[in-house]
UniProtKB/Swiss-Prot annotation:
The gene is Vegfa. One of its GO terms (cellular component) is endoplasmic reticulum. GO terms for biological process: angiogenesis; apoptotic process; artery morphogenesis; blood vessel development; blood vessel morphogenesis; bone trabecula formation; bone trabecula morphogenesis; branching involved in blood vessel morphogenesis. It comes from Mus musculus (Mouse). This is Vascular endothelial growth factor A, long form. The keyword DNA repair does not apply. Keywords: Angiogenesis, Cell membrane, Cytoplasm, Developmental protein, Differentiation, Disulfide bond, Endoplasmic reticulum, Extracellular matrix, Glycoprotein, Golgi apparatus, Growth factor, Heparin-binding, Membrane, Mitogen, Nucleus, Secreted. InterPro entries: Cystine-knot_cytokine, PD_growth_factor_CS, PDGF/VEGF_dom, PDGF/VEGF_growth_factor, VEGF_C, VEGF_C_sf. Disulfide bonds join C229-C271, C260-C305, C264-C307. Residues 121-143, 158-174 have a biased composition (Low complexity).
Amino acid sequence: MTDRQTDTAPSPSAHLLAGGLPTVDAAASREEPKPAPGGGVEGVGARGIARKLFVQLLGSSRSVVAVVCAAGDKPIGAGRSASSGLEKPGPEKRGEEEKEEERGPQWALGSQEPSSWTGEAAVCADSAPAARAPQAPARASVPEGRGARQGAQESGLPRSPSRRGSASRAGPGRASETMNFLLSWVHWTLALLLYLHHAKWSQAAPTTEGEQKSHEVIKFMDVYQRSYCRPIETLVDIFQEYPDEIEYIFKPSCVPLMRCAGCCNDEALECVPTSESNITMQIMRIKPHQSQHIGEMSFLQHSRCECRPKKDRTKPEKKSVRGKGKGQKRKRKKSRFKSWSVHCEPCSERRKHLFVQDPQTCKCSCKNTDSRCKARQLELNERTCRCDKPRR
């Protein structure tokens, strides 16, 4: 091989900077570097290859790495002479190499900051020694001739033993930092995925206590105890308790009271109160267009209840013994009026206290009069017998 062929041969660093990372066999990566015939070390070495594979796995942009490394490196054949093709190291390059060896493994790997983990600086540091590595075999092959120099160039990427040792000391530390970061990143990603998966399922199939109770079957004993005759809270209309106070509007119009309610075991029995008590509540009384105030009103409550036989309300009255005197005549007249009033239907089921019924004709009339409603600037509603606001 001639001098021109050796000068024009592609350098390994140029191939690396072009973007193509080397692919290494698994068996070759476990082999130890072999000594070259012209001196130096043959091959890149297992640790250098592993470092390049880590950079490739991290997915760093090869174009950015190539630009960064090309900006900082010089051509490989810049120091060679045109006539002989041998590299002239010079005193300046030797001084720079000695300074780099004194700086330590971190400068050899090109790490600038402790937080730089992308591995781009490591590739640049590997390419720079690879470009300067042919200096040792070139210097060693001068007395042996061109054959030894050609064998040293064909052996791959030779490196000096001192530089290989510094790289081997710094490589595991850099790789461990990268692996720690990758593991932590994977752990956080898995935790986030598990949280999102759990949140998705919880929204898709919500389970509440109300839905579970809606499908629950209530047992027979619970139904029996709840429906049996007992005092239970009931909403009672105030007008039902105070039928004479028709000039007021009450707020609220009904109050919660404990009243006897429920079922008995026999249809001939009914639930009736056996113990009663009074309770006082504050109710707002409103006189339309006049005044309103909060007053106290007393209501009747049931404390205890029992099932007792029903009273026969349709039972005919016993005939009174005929006798002489005015008292007997009055009783007979009252009984006649009662018998006649039985056939009359009630005027209203809800507001009986607002109507007056004639027992003979069963005609209903209002207790309120039109003049009484006009005195309050209201109008009498004959259908409901209440004083309502005038319509405009």
